[in-house]
Amino acid sequence: SVIVQSGNENIATVSQENHAYGGGDITESHVYQTGDLNSATVTQNNSKDSISEVFQVGGYNTANVIQIDSGSSVSNILQNGNDNIANVTQTNSAYSESIITQTGDSHLATVNQSGASQISLITQSTNAAIATHSQSGGAGNSATTLQY
């Protein structure tokens, strides 16, 4: 886990546990925050993969990532602006991937994935865009939202 913060009153909380899934191994989290009053919370449980990256530039941005049983589960959040919120919950996995890119201000992106081989891509620019992806059951689902 690598946390790099530049600015004032940024908060980063990373919890990585067990490393037991499939023989255990690899649970990474990279949090980079530049600006003021940004918050990032990453929770990764049983692992054998589980990589999460959070990049936040600006102020008052919030990123929450929960990856539970893993066997892959990749989350990448990039927020460049102010007052953006990104929430990712990936449970039970066997490969799930979420990529959220937000530029501008006051965006909200929420991704909930359960089941196998779920892929989610959300890209938001300008201001105040809202997107929610919920993928459960089945396998091989893909969702893309582009808001400009």
PLM-predicted stretches and their roles:
Residues S1-Y148:
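Low-complexity repeat regions of mature extracellularly deployed or surface/particle-associated proteins
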